[in-house]
Amino acid sequence: MQNQRIRIRLKAFDHRLIDQSTAEIVETAKRTGAQVRGPIPLPTRKERFTVLISPHVNKDARDQYEIRTHKRLVDIVEPTDKTVDALMRLDLAAGVDVQISLG
């Protein structure tokens, strides 16, 4: 796996879960002898929703909700075969979306 790079993008609604998952990935990669760059925090996406709480009139009565999507990026620069095997066996939290790309 020489001259390879593994790029891992993580997304989650809870920032504590995503930080815990990135720490597990970085620790696993370093333990198997790979060079790691990151975790790099990417911009947080904020989706806002406004809902009328009145059934008929009173347009001024509204509730506002927000969903924040936190993102992190981890680059594993020189992965070994042990690194790939350890990352495949790694069990992360259920609320974290993981995208892996080889480059």
UniProtKB/Swiss-Prot annotation:
One of its GO terms (biological process) is translation. GO terms for cellular component: ribonucleoprotein complex; ribosome. Keywords: Ribonucleoprotein, Ribosomal protein. It holds the Pfam family Ribosomal_S10. One of its GO terms (molecular function) is structural constituent of ribosome. InterPro entries: Ribosomal_uS10, Ribosomal_uS10_CS, Ribosomal_uS10_dom, Ribosomal_uS10_dom_sf. NCBIfam families: PRK00596.1, rpsJ_bact. Part of the 30S ribosomal subunit. Involved in the binding of tRNA to the ribosomes. Belongs to the universal ribosomal protein uS10 family. This is Small ribosomal subunit protein uS10. It comes from Tolumonas auensis (strain DSM 9187 / NBRC 110442 / TA 4). The lineage of its organism: Bacteria, Pseudomonadati, Pseudomonadota, Gammaproteobacteria, Aeromonadales.
